[in-house]
Every structure is written in C-alpha cells, then in structure tokens.
Amino acid sequence: MAELEPISVIVTSVGTEQQAVEISEELVARGLATCINVIPCLRSIYRWKGKVCTDSEYLLMIKTRSALFDTVAEAIRDIHSYELPEVLEFPVARAEHHFHAWVAAMATGVPDPEGEHESEPELNYD
C-alpha cells in the first residue's frame, strides 16, 4: 500500500452561521479543504481585553492536507471577522484509508472556478 500524504483537521470558530458558510465555501472553492463540518450551538467562554466573555459560536472542522496549514490559516485570517481568530491544527494520526486518500487527493491548493474538475480524481485504494 502506497504511503499517503499527511492530512490534518484544522479548527476555527466563528460568531455567525453566515460566516461559517462563507469561510467553508471559500476554502473548498479554493482547493484548500476537501470537506468542512459546521457544528452549531457552541458556547465559548474566554478572557479578552481584561474581561471574561461568553459567546455562542459555530465550530468549523476543516479536513485538508497538512502541507496546506499555513495557506488555510492565512485564508481564514483574511476572511474572518475576529481580530484574533482561533486556527488550530490537529494532525490525523490514523484515518480509514479510502477517506484519507480522498482528503489528500481533493485538497490540492488549486481553485477550480470553472468546475473543470467536476468529478473526483481517480483514487487508488490499494
């Protein structure tokens, strides 16, 4: 079995569903993420500028190739409304082989604005 390129889950949180969708669609369209789960109804408690704050947020779980972390983080910072967005990388120690291959193949870092690659690349599951 061929060794696959490392993948990661990158996590960020946002204050609105609209921003969660905006960031998710942008990252996928730019080829920076294969799949993003948007998890609603988080409660975040944190210290900011000398005060304890509590907010409702949406969590984004971004699946991508590990090599794209810096580019994904920069894209999130460019789009995000927060002054200091959370951007954390969790390298995936193990994943089901076919899923791993799909994430690695689809997160190319290259946008597909014309939909030229409407079908997924041929994946070798051996």
Which residues make up each language-model segment?
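Positively charged, small/polar-rich N-terminal and surface patches that mediate targeting and assembly
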Residues: 1-126
